[in-house]
């Protein structure tokens, strides 16, 4: 049998231990690098996720903006068309005073226009509202009550298209102004 020198064995053990230490250090370094790469990848993933969410939110906001813009364009186009129809309604109102047979035509036209958001302002017998009514005459009577509509007013999609021209009563005053 062969006998080994104690120094030689110690030297081999030392080399083995040192080799293991180096391997362990290399693995540790490699693991640290992998951990850093993993952490960077997770950070990048989070950044991309946030970017995606922002882009998605911006796209949804843009779609809502486009829809709102299209609806406004439609509403304005309808408003322009309906405004041009108001003199026709005024003519029908004047014609009804002479011929009741025009009432169904006016009703039909109002029904069609109401499908596009037009509403008549009902003022007669109600308290004067400066947002809905324009005073064209004042008569003696209860304060601020609309006694007569000289010209109908209209609301389109909750916005005043044309104010009603009205005669309003004022308490204790004689007829002061009556412009027709």
UniProtKB/Swiss-Prot annotation:
Origin superkingdom: Archaea
GO cellular component: cytoplasm
Function field: Participates actively in the response to hyperosmotic and heat shock by preventing the aggregation of stress-denatured proteins, in association with DnaK and GrpE. It is the nucleotide exchange factor for DnaK and may function as a thermosensor. Unfolded proteins bind initially to DnaJ; upon interaction with the DnaJ-bound protein, DnaK hydrolyzes its bound ATP, resulting in the formation of a stable complex. GrpE releases ADP from DnaK; ATP binding to DnaK triggers the release of the substrate protein, thus completing the reaction cycle.
Organism: Picrophilus torridus (strain ATCC 700027 / DSM 9790 / JCM 10055 / NBRC 100828 / KAW 2/3)
Protein name: Protein GrpE
GO molecular function: adenyl-nucleotide exchange factor activity; protein homodimerization activity; protein-folding chaperone binding; unfolded protein binding
Pfam families: GrpE (PF01025)
Main location: cytoplasm
Family in the record: Belongs to the GrpE family.
CDD domains: GrpE (cd00446)
Compartmental location: Cytoplasm
């Amino acid at each position: 049998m062969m006998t080994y020198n104690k120094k030689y064995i110690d030297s081999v053990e030392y080399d083995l231990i040192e080799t293991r230490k180096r391997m362990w250090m290399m693995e540790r370094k490699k693991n640290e690098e992998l951990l850093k790469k993993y952490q960077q990848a997770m950070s990048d993933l989070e950044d991309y996720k946030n970017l995606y969410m922002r882009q998605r939110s911006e796209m949804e906001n843009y779609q809502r903006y486009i829809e709102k813009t299209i609806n406004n364009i439609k509403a304005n186009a309808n408003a322009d068309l309906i405004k041009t129809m108001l003199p026709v309604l005024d003519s029908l109102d004047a014609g009804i005073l002479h011929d009741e047979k025009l009432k169904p035509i006016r009703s039909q036209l109002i029904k069609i226009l109401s499908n596009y958001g037009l509403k008549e302002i009902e003022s007669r017998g109600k308290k004067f509202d400066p947002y809905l009514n324009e005073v064209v005459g004042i008569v003696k009577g209860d304060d601020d009550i609309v006694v007569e509509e000289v010209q109908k007013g209209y609301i389109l999609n909750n916005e005043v298209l044309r104010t009603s021209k009205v005669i309003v009563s004022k308490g204790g005053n004689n007829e002061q102004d009556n412009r027709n």
